[in-house]
């Protein structure tokens, strides 16, 4: 298996990415969250010139954040800085959309978007809608070497639900999943293979990546130790953020756990968090407070909700032997790469996870 990192994107992400490269990681994936993080292409550009081997991926690009030629140009420009090391991940948007008060981007529109971007990267001239008008667009002089469309840029799609998995197969793209639970990861991997076959594609030709959010516990360490809470508390609260808006946008947890609390033992926490959420103002833009620090830090008023049970249930945390066993089962389920989040300020996670991975 390959192993990668993903990270909320600071402008100087290259420092974390270089550390991951030196530790033997294969990939680094950058979040496209425009009101929380630095610009994804700025950060990836710096990482491209500061690293030598590690592959750099958009994790993931949200179509509504930039028009087709801008996205294609960004990827082709990165490809000029790091030829053959750029990966193009796309998705309907979670954090980047929720944090501006929007639900997921339409799957049908994402299909057209990905087709157009990849068409431009092949040197073709797709027709797209710009300001309601159909226009043919393409790179006018790629032969100058200002960008690089000679080296292929593999495409992957974040597909947590059945419609996006069908789209992934239709476009013959690699697949990005999230490790919500072992049952979810195994079941969705089987479905992804079925979708590839239904689309006339060979599942073995496509890579399956799984983003896993967890901490490496020391022997005897509590799930709510200060160290663990710093590393994965922001992951646990992400699920609380998600549940508060599930009625409007659906839930990350919906496919395998329904909306609301994913475990009966957490119902009280979810109820109390809703009371906190409903206290946020302005009432028509509670998302402005709800998503502050999303996947980066726990806000002061959220701290009391980050319990050992919440972390144990909602994150992929465990001791090194436990995590190695889980990773082996992910490999058996068909995954080619495990990607772990490095929480800002907790870059030591790179070294902790590297020690887990080197024995797998």
Locate each region found by the language model.
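An alpha-helical appendage that flanks or caps ligand/catalytic pockets
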Residues: 103-144, 190-332
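Hydrophobic faces of well-ordered beta-strands that scaffold small-molecule active sites
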Residues: 3-7, 28-30, 56-59, 86-90, ...
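N-terminal beta1-alpha1-beta2 module of alpha/beta enzyme domains
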Residues: 1-58, 153, 343
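Conserved, mostly hydrophobic/aromatic
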Residues: 24, 47, 78, 117, ...
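Glycine-rich anion/phosphate-binding loops
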Residues: 64-77, 104
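Short, acidic/polar
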Residues: 9-20, 74, 159-167, 319-329
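Active-site mouth loops of central-metabolism enzymes
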Residues: 1-11, 61-69, 149-160, 214-218, ...
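Acidic-and-aromatic substrate-binding clefts and catalytic sites of carbohydrate-active enzymes
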Residues: 7-12, 32-39, 63-69, 182-186, ...
């Amino acid at each position: 298996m390959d192993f990668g990192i993903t990270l909320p994107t600071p402008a100087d992400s290259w420092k974390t990415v270089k550390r991951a490269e030196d530790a033997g990681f294969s990939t680094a994936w950058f979040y496209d969250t425009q009101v929380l993080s630095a610009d994804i292409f700025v950060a990836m550009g710096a990482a491209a010139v500061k690293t030598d081997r590690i592959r750099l991926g958009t994790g993931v690009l949200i179509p509504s954040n930039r028009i087709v030629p801008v996205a294609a140009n960004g990827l082709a420009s990165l490809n000029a800085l790091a030829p053959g090391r750029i990966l193009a991940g796309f998705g309907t948007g979670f954090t980047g959309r929720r944090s501006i008060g929007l639900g997921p981007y339409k799957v049908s529109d994402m299909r057209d978007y990905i087709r157009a971007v990849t068409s431009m990267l092949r040197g073709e001239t797709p027709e797209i809608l710009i300001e309601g008008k159909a226009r043919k667009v393409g790179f006018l002089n790629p032969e100058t070497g200002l960008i690089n469309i000679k080296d292929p840029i593999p495409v992957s799609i974040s597909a947590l639900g059945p419609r996006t998995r069908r789209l992934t197969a239709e476009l013959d793209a690699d697949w990005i999943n999230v490790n919500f639970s072992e049952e979810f990861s195994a079941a969705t991997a089987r479905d992804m293979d079925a979708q590839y076959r239904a689309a006339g594609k060979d599942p073995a030709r496509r890579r399956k990546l799984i983003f896993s959010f967890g901490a490496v516990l020391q022997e005897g360490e509590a799930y709510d130790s200060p160290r663990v809470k710093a590393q994965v508390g922001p992951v646990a609260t992400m699920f609380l953020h998600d549940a508060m808006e599930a009625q409007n946008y659906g839930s990350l947890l919906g496919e395998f756990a329904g909306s609301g609390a994913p475990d009966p033992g957490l119902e009280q926490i979810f109820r109390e968090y809703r009371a906190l959420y409903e206290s946020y103002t302005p009432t028509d833009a509670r998302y402005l407070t709800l998503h502050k620090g999303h996947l980066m830090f726990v806000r002061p008023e959220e701290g009391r909700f980050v319990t050992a049970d919440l972390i144990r249930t909602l994150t992929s945390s465990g001791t090194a032997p436990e995590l190695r066993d889980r990773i082996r089962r992910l490999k058996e389920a068909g995954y080619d790469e495990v990607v772990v989040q490095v929480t800002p300020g907790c870059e030591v996670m790179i070294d902790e996870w590297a020690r887990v991975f080197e024995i797998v």
